[in-house]
């Protein structure tokens, strides 16, 4: 089979790496891809991933049998609809279904209508009304831009001033453009966050291994929010019982609700959860694999990813038996100095082969090739991943790989998986 992966980050490198392990994957293409993906796929850099017509044309030229969509923007832009119309199978939700991530107000209203546990909320299009509501509710409180904001449109305000500043930034200053013309304001939920991703064909739902992300830039969960500085799987807070509860109370009802609304959901559904005293509640839904969650979830998948994705596209997921490894995986992100704010690019990266020789996987997130050398080209540059029998061994192995890699201004968190390790110490 010929397979096309759309995207260029660490998530897409992981997807391509896993797909390449399937005996069914005869030829892999990536658009635009990255230098790491070039090990397993032919990268085609001159096609705009938001131009559906060009993507369909490329898929037809290369006789693509399956398209795998990484990022959210092409999904909300209807790339799966365009592929299906051309008779090409694609893994991912159609445009109407991707709205579950594309509009936070749609997602919250859906949960309210179908009784899916989430935080209390109100939706505002008027900044003044939003400010009045915040003054009435008080802090801590959560302010979210309604549309896609590259994972940066959520502000957890611990004080009233922070909350009012957030409304000013999102609505008055239009920091996220049109995405912030409407905001969702939510009650602050107390608890521990975890991510639960699931494969679905619109009827059957198969949860993946749980994971936990580290959003803050610096150790001790300090500093600004980022796209994610590291992850580990499984998350101890997601016990077997908790996964069962989340599947029955959240995942299954959400897929059923989407079908009922005439928006059947196929692909990967990502539930960002808060594990509260009352049980799991939805923080947000994403319409695709998480980044960097994918980097720890897929290395633990024992089954053939191509088979699973085809079953999701064909509506035959109930016939698949999906197996997971009992071990643990840890991903540590190496970022450019200054990230998530302004950073410099173009620094040569050393030690990639050394890290691989230590038994770690190195997924490229923000790299480019220049004069035959791999250089930095993004905020999050690499994800170094280790699998082992347990979390502690995976952490130790991952950091050995991280310490082998150098480039100017590189930084990483040194406490990835600290919550899991603290739980082990407490026992």
What are these regions (language model features)?
Residues 91-153:
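A conserved helix-loop-beta module that forms one wall/lid of the active-site cleft
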Residues 21-23, 36-38, 61, 91, ...:
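Solvent-exposed alpha-helices and their adjacent loops that cap or buttress functional pockets
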Residues 311-427:
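Peripheral (often C-terminal) accessory segments that flank ATP-dependent C-N-forming ligase machineries
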Residues 43-50, 122-126, 157:
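Short acidic-hydrophobic, aromatic-tinged amphipathic segments that line or gate anion-handling sites
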């Amino acid at each position: 089979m010929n397979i096309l992966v759309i995207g260029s980050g660490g998530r897409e490198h992981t997807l391509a790496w896993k797909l390449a392990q399937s005996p069914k994957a005869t030829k892999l293409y990536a658009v635009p891809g990255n230098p790491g993906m070039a090990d397993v796929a032919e990268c085609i850099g001159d096609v705009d991933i938001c131009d559906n017509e060009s993507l369909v044309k490329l898929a037809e030229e290369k006789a693509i049998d399956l398209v795998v969509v990484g990022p959210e923007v092409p999904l909300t832009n209807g790339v799966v609809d365009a592929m299906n119309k051309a008779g090409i199978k694609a893994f991912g939700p159609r445009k109407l279904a991707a709205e579950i991530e594309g509009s936070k107000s749609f997602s919250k209203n859906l949960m309210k209508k179908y009784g899916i546990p989430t935080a209390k909320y109100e939706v505002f299009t008027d900044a003044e009304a939003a400010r009045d509501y915040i003054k009435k509710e008080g802090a801590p409180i959560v302010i979210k831009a309604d549309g896609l904001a590259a994972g940066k449109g959520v502000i957890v305000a611990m004080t009233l001033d922070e909350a009012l500043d957030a409304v000013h930034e999102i609505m008055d200053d239009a920091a996220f453009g049109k995405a912030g013309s409407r905001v969702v304001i939510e009650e602050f939920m107390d608890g521990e966050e975890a991510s639960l991703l699931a494969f679905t064909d619109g009827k059957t739902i198969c949860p993946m291994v749980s994971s936990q992300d580290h959003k803050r830039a610096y150790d001790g969960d300090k500093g600004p929010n980022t796209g994610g500085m590291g992850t580990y799987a499984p998350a101890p807070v997601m016990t077997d019982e908790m996964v069962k509860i989340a599947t029955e109370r959240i995942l299954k009802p959400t897929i059923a609700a989407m079908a009922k609304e005439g928006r059947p959901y196929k692909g990967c559904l990502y539930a960002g959860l808060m594990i509260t005293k009352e049980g799991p509640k939805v923080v947000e839904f994403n319409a695709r694999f998480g980044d960097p969650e994918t980097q720890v979830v897929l290395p633990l998948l024992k089954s053939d990813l191509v088979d699973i994705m085809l079953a999701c596209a064909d509506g035959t997921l109930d016939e698949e038996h999906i197996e997971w490894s009992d071990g643990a995986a840890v991903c540590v992100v190496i970022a450019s100095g200054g990230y998530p704010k302004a950073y410099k690019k173009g620094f040569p990266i050393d030690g990639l082969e050394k890290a691989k020789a230590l038994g770690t996987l190195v997924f490229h997130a923000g790299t480019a090739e220049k004069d035959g050398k791999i250089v930095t080209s993004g905020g999050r540059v690499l994800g170094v991943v280790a699998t082992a029998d347990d979390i502690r061994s995976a952490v130790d192995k991952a950091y050995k790989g991280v310490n082998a890699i150098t480039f100017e201004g590189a930084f990483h968190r040194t406490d990835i998986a600290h919550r899991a390790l603290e739980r082990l110490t407490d026992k």
